Amino acid sequence: MVLFRTAPFTLGLLGLILIQIITFYLGIVIHPVMFFLIPILVLATVWLVHRPEFTLLMIGFTSIIKGFIQEQFPIFETLDFTLLLIIILWAGLAKIAFTGKWGLPEWTRDILILFALFCGMVFVSGFYTPSPVSGWLKIGRFLIFASSMFVAPFVFLRNISDSIRMLNYFKFLSATILVAMLINLLFIATSGGLFTYLVRASLLGANPIAVSRSLAVIAAMVTVIGIRREGWKRLTALVFLALILLAIVSTGSRGPLASFFAGIILFMLMFESSVYRSRLVLVGGISIMIVFGLLFALPESLTTRFMQITQGDVIVTAGGVERVSTIATRLNFWRISIQGWLSSPSYFLFVKGDGGFSSFFVWRDFRWYPHNIFFEVLLEQGFVGFILLIMMIAVAVRYLLKVRKSGMLSEHSSVWVAATLVIFFSAQVSGDINDNRILLMFLAIGLSSIHLDRRFRESITA
């Protein structure tokens, strides 16, 4: 019994000794900075293990920072940074299990069963996909990353304080992204970078769409929180919203900007209480005026993609300078998806398999997708996969509305639900199912949070 009690201390001591040996070795062999870097990384890892909420949000924002980290630290060219965070996330979930607090709530059973069936279809589709290389990579990313991001919130969000703490982490990361983006814009302006044909501002070299998608979610958070404030706090939130809209416009990404407005409108119609609905309409109208003001006030290099929606963009290709319409390309991709789905009876049910969309093009086995989550699932998982996806959405919406009818959503729950709706609309115009896996994360957080709201109200009235 004594030996059993001292085992954790002994293992911890051996672990510290091993870390010291590795630190000294790498500090001598590689660079003296390792003497400081390794202890910091160890402490950061331990901190993340104890805070799976922050780790999960970091995974959601990896599309912004991953490229920069790979460029600065070549080791992450081999070691996937997202996979490393997933391992840390599961270490945090394992810690919860060891403390006896592990468990998936009973109310999640239906949606988790549907999600498991959908994952099974995704896996099986890899055996008949015409694009095995890109297909299996896509399957692996979805089963490892998306599944972890969907299941984790159901485990670690156990009370309202957990949801509030996660919202505070989200605020911190959002503020960091916004400040970094505004500093980058200031640098572009002062260095003469605006005097070109087209500027699509980004952050750390990330895809502007990924940055804009994150900013749209941040805008939804600021809007939902701002209308619940009074006096100067509401005015401050409006100023922050204007800065976020400036950052979104500067990315040149039209889809996330439209998704922000679509998500807020649907949130107002379905979930917002009558107390704040009029305020949300007012803020929405002001936001539209801010966007139009930015489009007329900013340099043409930043607003070109918004002003030339029907004409398309002038780009340099292997065949020379061409004008390409993103909207026309998207519509063509959707048409190809529908035609492929209806091309034969077997395709109608199970279709191409994961990654199969690229088989319609000359490169065949390549990461390519129709930029719409429904058309993507319809083509690659067939009617069966499409029905499973629709059923998942129906179960989630039914539960959201059920809890909404029982009382007003809390501030933190409103943020998560609004973020889910914004990403849902964004998934209809850009990215594939892996690019939009953050949708599953926000959906799980939103469902967990409103369940905690409901349980809290029941405990008060009991």
Language-model-detected regions and their locations in the chain:
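N-terminal signal-anchor transmembrane segment
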Residues: 2-96, 121-128
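Loop-to-helix entry and N-terminal half of a specific, functionally important transmembrane alpha helix
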Residues: 174, 372, 398-429, 443-445
